[in-house]
Swiss-Prot record:
Chain positions recorded as substrate binding sites: 368-372
Taxonomic lineage of the native organism: Bacteria, Bacillati, Cyanobacteriota, Cyanophyceae, Synechococcales
Subcellular location: Cytoplasm
Entry keyword annotation includes Nuclease: yes
Region annotated Disordered, chain positions: 578-640
GO BP, sorted A to Z: rRNA processing
Cofactor note: Binds up to 2 Zn(2+) ions per subunit. It is not clear if Zn(2+) or Mg(2+) is physiologically important.
Bias type Basic and acidic residues, positions: 598-610
Protein name as it appears in the record: Ribonuclease J
Alphabetical list of CDD domains matching this protein: RNaseJ_MBL-fold
Length: 640
């Protein structure tokens, strides 16, 4: 029996890229079939300690993996394809269609991650149509952007055509001679576009975004004026910009040494596919370039965004093994900082200048243009497509608002425009658009080991802000201390004497054992069993309260227990170890008496060891110690 398309709805679920820059990921769902459009990443902020990349929460796709029919990719930027290798570890994507350059870059990523066998990569040509499942047919329409081989998409669904602009600007003098296919866009507008989802990045900017070709005379001037070594940094994926730089190097008779893995990779693929045309002898290894006269050298490198491990950042820090800044060097930043990177870029520029480099940077130099459309280009796309419904995407909140205002000015009724959040479920019928619900929409953080969960990030942040206090205590099966506890503080601002803090900690442990030991013991058949895990958690909480009260801060508290009681392996908590009864001398349980004198007096214990932040770690009481981060709960805006 045929399904009634008048009552069915098309669902559109943006999982990333809204009210932010990066993580562009969108899901289209109809009749139990899912089409995925792009799957990008973002880069971590300064407070995401140890994190390499940020991904959208893909819980919805993990839970509906059997519905996924495939993916379409608009272009090869990291914020559109950078997450795919990570996601393939969690769910299969049967087939991925995309431009030649994007697929070449993606293939490298998947091979490196060992994920190439989890999907099938297929390249497309302009105006090519592909079918995914029974519900979706997608046509690829060439647009213009800062990377070669970029597309907008016409997604045919049972309810009508939904157009997605991809990242775009309307460049009338493109470097590669490939124009935005506005004719095809207009044809869809004539036939009728149900909904348009459009890039909002530069929706605040009046006028028209300058052509990529406009940077050529300004960069040419810089090349002409540079008397010594010339170093240029830009986005590795800005193929058109890289092509301009290489052409100018050839014109000014400079040999090019390419530094940075991503830059080398993109240039290799772009040359193979014909997007960059230059002779082989233009390039020299970095070691060979150092033997050339300064005026014949051009070092093309990554690091335009101040990335910590990128080549230009390492050069500015004096950490690059082969490149040291010297007086007379000219360094060109042919890129503007993306949101969140401004401080890192400014610091990199400052360090380069301090070492004597002449640094060329900033919008006033005319050496960079955006790859995103400004207001007049947005108006043109709206006029050509004439969509019934409109959803601004790919941008921060103010950009989305400005874009929606332009759409209203172009004649789209306000009730036909929705500004949505990541995770919102847009429900689209032939005559209505609405937000019908929400799916998980947080973020997933990835470090070198894998996914970083919320609790781990909270612990890292806590240690970064307030430091770490570790307490090691050895207990007997009767609840007495086998030895005087060890206390170590790292990164903690001490508002009281370390010795006094140690004595307070010891007294808290002794009081706890005296007053509450019986809560964690129970007997059977004449033997006594101890709930070590529960005891550890409660004692650790008591120490946390004490330290917070005394230090007026909240360092992470890590309690490590040792016991002389044999314990079954499945009963041993991660931070409890067993010790031989002979490995430590039992210490008599004694109260530590604190007085109001400047130096508290306590009965001397021969085995006592006092450890402060200035001392190296003391030898442990026993030969076995297990260290573990505590699982203290902490509120955080990061979701797993």
């Amino acid at each position: 029996m045929a399904k009634n398309t008048q009552t069915q709805a098309l669902k559109i679920l943006p999982l990333g890229g809204l009210h932010e820059i990066g993580k562009n990921t969108c899901v289209f769902e109809y009749d139990d079939e899912i089409l995925l459009l792009d799957a990008g990443l973002a880069f971590p902020t300064d407070d995401m300690h140890g994190v390499n990349v940020v991904l959208p929460d893909m819980t919805y796709l993990r839970e509906n993996r059997e519905k996924i029919k495939g993916m379409v990719v608009t272009h090869g930027h990291e914020d559109h394809i950078g997450g795919i290798a990570y996601h393939l570890k969690q769910f299969d994507i049967p087939i991925i269609y995309g431009p030649r350059l994007a697929m070449a870059l993606l293939r490298d990523k998947l091979e490196e991650a060992g994920m190439l066998e989890r999907t099938n990569l297929q390249t497309v040509s302009p105006r090519e149509m592909v079918r995914l499942g029974k519900s979706f047919v997608v046509e690829f329409i060439r647009n213009t952007h800062s990377i070669a081989d970029s597309y907008c998409l016409a997604i045919h669904t049972p309810l009508g055509v939904v157009m997605h602009s991809g990242d775009f600007k309307i460049d009338h003098t493109p470097i590669d001679g490939e124009f935005f296919d506005l004719q095809k866009v207009a044809e869809y507008g004539e036939k009728g576009v149900l909904c348009l989802l459009s890039d909002s990045t530069n929706a605040e900017v009046p006028g028209i975004t300058p052509s990529e070709a406009s940077v050529i005379p300004n960069l040419d001037r810089v090349f002409s004026q540079a008397e010594g070594r010339l170093m240029v940094t830009t986005f590795a994926s800005s193929v058109h910009r890289v092509n301009i730089i290489l052409s100018l190097a050839q014109k000014h008779q400079r040999k090019v040494a390419v530094v940075g893995r991503s830059m080398l990779n993109v240039i290799a693929h772009a040359r193979k596919l014909g997007y960059i045309k230059c002779p082989d002898n233009l390039f020299v290894p970095l070691k060979a370039a150092r033997n050339l006269p300064d005026q014949q050298q051009l070092i093309l490198t990554t690091g335009s965004q101040g990335e910590p491990l990128a080549a230009m950042t390492r050069i500015s820090n004096g950490e690059h093994p082969q490149i040291k800044i010297r007086q007379g060097d000219t360094v060109v930043f042919s890129a503007n900082p993306i949101p969140g990177n401004t401080i890192a870029v400014v610091n990199t520029i400052d360090r380069l200048m301090m070492q004597g480099a002449n640094v060329i940077y900033g919008k006033h130099q005319g050496i960079h243009v955006s790859g995103h459309a400004s207001q007049e280009e947005h108006k043109m796309l709206l006029a050509l497509t004439r969509p019934k419904f409109f959803v601004p995407v790919h941008g921060e909140h103010r950009m989305l608002v400005k874009h929606s205002q332009m759409a209203q000015a172009q004649g789209i009724p306000s009730e036909n425009i929705v500004i949505v959040n990541n995770g919102d479920v847009i429900e689209l019928t032939g005559d209505r658009i609405r937000v019908a619900g929400q799916v998980p929409s947080g973020i997933e953080l990835v470090d070198q080991a894998g996914i970083v969960h919320e609790s781990t990030m909270a612990e890292r942040q806590q240690m970064a802000e307030d430091g770490l206090v570790t307490v090691a205590a050895a207990l007997s099966k009767t609840g007495t201390l086998l030895a005087y506890p060890e206390v170590h503080c790292r990164g903690v601002v001490m508002t009281i004497q370390p010795k006094l803090l140690e004595e307070l900690i010891v007294r808290t442990i002794e009081n706890f054992l005296t007053e509450r030991w019986s809560e964690f013991t129970h007997g059977s058949n004449g033997s006594t069993e101890v709930s070590w895990n529960a005891l550890q958690k409660e004692l650790e909480s008591s120490l946390q309260r004490l330290i917070k009260r005394e230090l007026q801060s909240s360092p992470m508290v890590l309690l490590m227990l040792q016991t002389d009681t044999p314990i079954e392996l499945d009963q041993v908590p991660q931070n409890v170890s067993t010790v031989s009864a002979t490995s430590a001398t039992p210490a008599p349980r004694k109260k530590v008496v604190l007085t109001k004198t400047p130096e508290p007096k306590v009965k001397a214990k021969p085995e006592k060891k006092v450890v402060t932040t200035a001392e190296p770690s003391a030898q442990p009481v026993s030969t076995t110690k297990v260290y573990r981060r505590s699982r203290k709960r902490s509120t955080t805006s990061v979701s797993s």
